[in-house]
Design a protein with these regions (language model features):
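Long amphipathic N-terminal alpha/beta scaffold segment
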Residues: 1-32, 36
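Active-site-proximal loop/helix of nucleotide/amide-processing enzymes and allied scaffolds
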Residues: 2-5, 27, 37, 41-132
Length: 132
């Protein structure tokens, strides 16, 4: 619940989508936080190269990713699912655990982990790797 309150406050004034990465140690302490935006009201894209550099330098055990939906509706889109899968693959290649993907709306936060979607996406990403 603390992270939900933090994220609701972080994104409450945002008029465009923003993406936040919270890097965690093995004992779930925050090592580093980073916020990305490209000032697009319809979505946010994360450039994988600087993002990869950041978590390569920090060397987290796990990462929580979060972004806002300025519309106020935290329901995930197909685009959100696709981005989650790409990030899950990137983290897996680097032995980093994707702890959760949170989507922040006006008053509520959607959790991929709590909804069960995260496990499905990670399994799907792992199956794709197995086929390479």
């Amino acid at each position: 619940d603390d992270i939900k309150i933090y994220l609701l406050n972080l994104f409450k004034a945002a008029t465009a989508e923003q993406f936040c990465a919270i890097y965690l140690s093995k004992n779930e302490r925050i090592l580093f936080k980073e916020v990305y935006t490209d000032n697009d009201k319809n979505g946010v894209s994360v450039d994988m190269i600087p993002f990869s550099r950041s978590f390569s330098n920090v060397k987290p055990y796990a990462v929580v990713i979060a972004h806002n939906h300025p519309s106020g509706n935290p329901a995930p889109s197909v685009r959100d699912d696709t981005a989650t899968e790409k990030l899950a693959m990137l983290f897996s290649l680097n032995n980093v655990r994707l702890y959760d993907h949170l989507i922040v709306g006006a008053t509520d936060v959607f959790s991929y982990r709590m909804d069960g979607r995260l496990d499905k996406i990670i399994r799907s990403a792992n199956l794709r790797f197995a086929g390479l």
